[in-house]
Amino acid sequence: MTIGNKQNTKRNRFTTLSAFFNFIINTLDPGLQNPCEASILKKMFKRSQIIQWNILEKDIVNEIIFRTTNPRNRIMLELMSRAGMRISEVLKLTPNDTDGRKLILRHPKSGRDKELVYIPQRFSNRLEDYIQMKGLGNNERIFPITYGTARGMVRKAGKIVNVLLRPHDLRRFAATYASRSGTPIEIVSKVILRHANLSTTQRYLGKEYGSTPT
């Protein structure tokens, strides 16, 4: 019933089996015990609670970005909130990873050799200007700061508008705003968030059962 199947399929089959035993008990054998009522099985096939993420509004994100005066920080915030990049992906970027409106992610989380991120031309121009201003070599990191420093920068940016802000809130905003603007969920999933499956994107958008974001 369960081997080789996804957890959601397992839960559905468990529910069906439990309903079958209840039917037998109610119609044929009231003394029969439903084996699906065993606590260990109920715990194993328990459905996850729905998680409601706090989604940032567009005007809040715009204000955060516009009021961030440090060029490096502003570009990093835009890469997360406009392009849907993970903070770890932003920190790995080098000039060699930029190709006009395309950013190349090498050895991404998905396990592929590379993935592409698409950004507006105007934003691409500002990124190139920043790289030239810093005089960076092709393989130097564009944002040579630690993960902790980057998270702290995001939190500080959120305080500008009295919002508790985390890097993944910005990535989730990119997905939500695109979806609300009419972008098909398949495009949001494969192009913006680069998820392996659609169900992960649905959780981002609050349309499925919650789990840890990726």
Model-derived regions, located:
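N-terminal core-binding DNA-recognition domain of tyrosine recombinases/integrases
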Residues: 1-50, 134
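Active-site/catalytic core of tyrosine-dependent DNA strand-transfer enzymes
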Residues: 120-163
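Alpha-helix N-cap/helix-start motif at helix boundaries, enriched for small hydrophobics
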Residues: 17, 76-77, 84, 88-93, ...
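DNA breakage-rejoining catalytic core of tyrosine-based enzymes
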Residues: 44-62, 111-121, 137-138
